[in-house]
UniProtKB/Swiss-Prot annotation:
The Inhibitor I9 domain, residue ranges: 36-115
Protein's UniProt keywords contain tRNA processing: no
Location of the active site: 161 (charge relay system), 192 (charge relay system), 346 (charge relay system)
Location, primary (coarse class): secreted
EC number: 3.4.21.-
Subcellular location: Secreted
Name recorded for this polypeptide: Subtilisin-like protease CPC735_013700
Native source organism of the sequence: Coccidioides posadasii (strain C735)
Length: 400
């Protein structure tokens, strides 16, 4: 499956008197020891944040010098629209003192993230593109993809994933390297990010065949952590802002896991900048409200459909789902000039990111209006979905 899983946080929290909430892990053995994500309250000024960070650095240095303990302190700092946060490695005494600071909203332990196995079926038929360009299911007689020749030109898509093989010839030079929050390698070792990017923008299998892909690598193997993903979002927002592209940018996150306030807040604040944020619902057939960033209302949450316009057996569902898109046996790119087939809500989200970029270019609308527009255009075609789940299936408004 193409969905990236993350270990869950329980809804329970450790209450500290007159202090910020420290979320408690559901599976303690899966937490990265002494690593935390600290999120500040909305409205904290840059000056106050800088002062707080300096205080933490000084306190951490003093504590560890006094007790001769190794430690890293603050490692990464995030500033995503209204969200100010940082991650790092702290001992229990330090984190309890941080929690008592009045500007701190909540603290989460950093957790391991793992990517699930990906199935590959060579030479399988591609069907997602023709399906999203017609109102009625015509797959038995039609394999043509109908789209406007603008094809998303002028739109940037940040693929927050395992990396992208930017040299794959099917990208026609439109894929570029952005950053990595996990290592210095520009290689997509797993192929997941390349496949996702190919569905979004490749010449042969892409929904929006003229957009620019920017690779944001947050996985170096099958595990990563929340702080790496949030760091990728932070970089994408800053890069887009620097280039005056916020309202013309898409963030695709074909990943997720146990519900996380920090992850949701990062996704929400990316949306608030003007970007279109598309995320996968999850590859476990349960309520998507259990997952993040799928449970974030400002993210466009995508469930997977099959060739018969039914909810895919593996797809998450529920009121958090905004739209369905093709997600089973999807043919796209894999590294080293190859092609392959994968299934998952990751692939469904990629279709929506591509369609979002396409509509942004065609209708000249900002990214943070795109999810509602896609839902307006979508057809009530899903013939079998779970209770309280939309029946809306992605449609690119081709007129067919």
């Amino acid at each position: 499956m193409g969905f990236v899983k993350i270990l869950s946080l329980s809804l329970a929290a450790t209450a500290v008197a007159d202090a910020a909430t420290i979320l408690s892990p559901r599976y303690p053995n899966d937490v990265i020891p002494n690593e935390y994500i600290v999120v500040m309250k909305d409205g904290v000024s840059s000056a106050s944040f800088a002062s707080h960070s300096a205080w933490v650095a000084d306190m951490h240095y003093y504590n560890h010098t006094k007790r001769a303990l190794p430690g890293h302190g603050i490692q990464e700092v995030y500033d995503i629209y209204e969200m100010k946060a940082y991650s790092g490695k702290f001992d229990e005494d330090t984190i309890q003192r941080i929690a008592k600071e009045p500007d701190v909203a909540f603290i989460e332990p950093n957790q391991i993230v793992t990517i699930s196995e990906i199935s590959v079926q060579k030479a399988a038929p591609s069907w997602g593109l023709p399906r999203i360009s017609v109102k009625e299911n015509q797959l038995s007689s039609n394999t043509d993809y109908f789209y406007d020749s603008s094809a998303g030109a002028g739109i940037w898509v940040y693929v927050v994933d395992t990396g992208v093989d930017i040299k794959h010839p099917d990208f026609e030079g439109r894929a570029v390297w952005g950053t990595s929050t996990v290592d210095r390698s520009k290689t997509d070792r797993l192929g997941h990010g390349t496949h996702v990017a190919g569905t979004i923008a490749s010449k042969t299998y892409g929904v929006a065949k003229a957009v620019k892909i920017i690779a944001v690598k947050v996985f170096k193997d099958r595990t990563t952590s929340y702080k790496n993903i949030i760091g990728g979002i932070d970089w994408a927002v800053k890069h887009s802002k620097k280039n005056n592209m916020l309202s013309k940018s898409v963030v695709n996150m074909s990943l997720g896991g146990g519900r996380s306030s920090a992850m949701n807040k990062a996704a929400a604040n990316a949306h608030k900048t003007g970007m279109f944020v598309a995320v996968s619902a999850g590859n476990t057939p349960v309520d998507a409200m259990n997952f993040s960033p799928a449970s974030e209302p400002l993210a466009c949450t995508v469930a997977a459909s099959d060739k018969d316009d039914m909810q895919a057996q593996f797809s998450a569902f529920g009121p958090a789902v905004d739209i369905f898109a093709p997600g089973t046996d999807i043919v796209s790119l894999v590294p080293r000039k190859k092609f392959g087939t994968k299934s998952g809500t990751s692939m469904a989200a990629a279709h929506v990111s591509g369609a979002g970029a396409y509509i942004m270019a065609l209708e000249k609308i900002p990214g943070n209006e795109v999810c509602n527009r896609l839902k307006e255009l979508a057809q009530s075609s899903i013939v079998r979905s779970s209770d309280k789940t939309t029946r809306k299936l992605l449609y690119n408004n081709s007129g067919k």
